């Protein structure tokens, strides 16, 4: 999947994109590109989500050989986000863009839309990915990764914080948008 994700990173995000990306769907042919509908296909944190499972396996087993084998996947996914995230213009947060909160939509100026900057799901997945990658390098004693890990730790501090909406729930987007379907089965 990683070689396919490296190609997708370059093809869809340009030559500055490093590492690899996995959007929210894949198949046995290592499909990593965006899906055909923006309400779910624009979400580019599938690789971060998969890496969370790699980390959880290590956290459960403590298998250092396994961690050394999967570290390149963690690092590559982190490199992708470090090289492609942008500054949200209103508050200066480091965000994924374009993206979406999968399959959910909100109203903006009376129109149902799905594309946004920095949905909460992405922010949490990237936060965990950066923290887990830095912890993996430290656990493995990879002192040559110190500068890279410092950049991950710095980036974590620039991600948007979780915010509570006017109605008392975790906001799904950076803005407290009105959801088109308040009973939607997916939440951030």
Please report, for each region that a protein language model flagged, where it lies by residue.
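Active-site core of glycosidic bond-cleaving carbohydrate-active enzymes
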Residues: 1-7, 15, 26-64, 68, ...
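A motif-centric feature for acidic-aromatic and gly/ser/thr-rich catalytic loops and repeats
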Residues: 22
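Acidic/histidine-rich catalytic neighborhood
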Residues: 76-136
